[in-house]
């Protein structure tokens, strides 16, 4: 089936290694992740980050080619002990003494921390030297998109060639921001970092975002709506990366964006400006319906009638939304980018159609999960769309 663009590239990378007749392929499966400011029970990568290693190895049948897959399961949300346990298990397979493996693991972790601190320090130093007329472009994407020239389509070099300073999301203190009150159920750490970065960029008049999303990425389809809300009236360039991109088309979009920035008025920073002092707009999505407003339930198959009856027994004026119509779907698609999975514009369109019929205050039931697929973000994103 169709996968996101980064997973397609993993297929290619592994095939290259097969052609080189390697003995081992190291590709971890990342189950949970870590974000210091997150308040969700667990943080997750996408489903592909959890399953790509094993599924691709099976699809390419690497075992029959004499290649061993080394794919420890990383539960970064469970702390250092879980990480150590996953990595130390490789020492037996590779015939490496555990103390040697533990030392390498510790050295690697320390190197990552030093690098993270150094990059943020570098970004802070750059921002301190800016003149009012300076315009800095911030590349917004996940870490692997920053370093892979195929995933970023050479855009950093194209921007540098045109005389602009370019930094990455890692140069900004996004990890220090606590946005949990605004995004209670955002279980993607990279999503938390991207939206924190959006707040910082929107707040600083000299910073402008170049936001790279990946074709076929479920989380990106949701984050794009929230990113747009964060940027408000500030212009930014968003490019969806896939294998069909045209270099000429990318250059045309870049030059149009840069030309628009040249016409932006110069804004002088206040002397007491603090980058991290951004607006946090709490957004609480209640789990229990109120009795003062009608409650509309989306189509849930045979459960719709049961849930409607249950809520009515609790004193809530509950109703089932009509079955999806072509008009409702068109309303949903008008508010989306055509990259979202079909259930999202269908659900959104049903709500918008009902609001057309009766614009009075109402409640809509949108069940949500706590990881790791995109549907767990539907409620928050629909709230953002309704707030436009």
Pin down the residues of each PLM region.
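An N-terminal assembly and electron-transfer interface module characteristic of large anaerobic redox
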Residues: 1-388
């Amino acid at each position: 089936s169709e996968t996101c663009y980064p997973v397609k590239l993993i297929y290619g990378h592994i095939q290259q290694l097969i052609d080189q007749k390697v003995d081992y392929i190291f590709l971890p499966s990342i189950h949970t992740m870590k974000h210091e400011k997150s308040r969700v029970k667990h943080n997750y990568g996408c489903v592909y980050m959890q399953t790509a290693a094993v599924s691709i190895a099976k699809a390419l049948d690497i075992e029959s080619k004499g290649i061993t897959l080394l794919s420890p399961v990383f539960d970064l949300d469970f702390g250092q002990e879980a990480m150590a346990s996953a990595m130390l298990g490789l020492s037996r397979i590779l015939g490496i003494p555990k103390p040697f493996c533990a030392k390498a693991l510790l050295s690697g972790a320390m190197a990552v921390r030093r690098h993270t601190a150094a990059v943020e320090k570098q970004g802070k130093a750059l921002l301190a030297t800016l003149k009012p007329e300076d315009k800095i472009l911030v590349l917004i994407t996940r870490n692997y998109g920053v370093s892979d020239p195929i995933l970023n389509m050479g855009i950093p070099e194209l921007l540098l060639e045109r005389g602009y300073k370019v930094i990455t999301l890692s140069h900004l203190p996004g990890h220090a921001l606590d946005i949990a009150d605004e995004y209670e159920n955002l279980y993607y750490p990279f999503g938390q970092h991207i939206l924190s970065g959006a707040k910082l960029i929107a707040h600083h008049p000299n910073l402008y975002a170049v936001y790279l999303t990946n074709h076929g990425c479920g989380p990106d389809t949701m984050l794009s709506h929230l990113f747009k809300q964060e940027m408000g009236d500030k212009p930014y360039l968003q490019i969806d990366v896939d294998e069909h991109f045209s270099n000429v088309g990318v250059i045309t979009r870049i030059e149009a964006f840069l030309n628009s920035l040249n016409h932006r008025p110069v804004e002088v920073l206040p002397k007491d400006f603090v980058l991290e002092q951004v607006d946090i707009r709490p957004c609480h999505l209640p789990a229990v319906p109120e009795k003062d407003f009608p409650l509309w339930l989306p189509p849930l198959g045979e459960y719709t009638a049961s849930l409607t009856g249950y809520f009515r027994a609790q004193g809530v004026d509950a109703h089932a939304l009509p079955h999806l119509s072509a008009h409702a779907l068109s309303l949903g698609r008008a508010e989306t980018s055509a990259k979202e999975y079909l259930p999202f514009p269908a659900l959104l369109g049903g709500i918008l159609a009902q609001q057309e019929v009766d614009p009075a205050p109402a409640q809509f039931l949108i069940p949500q999960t706590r990881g790791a697929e995109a549907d767990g973000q539907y409620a928050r994103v629909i709230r953002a769309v309704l707030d436009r």
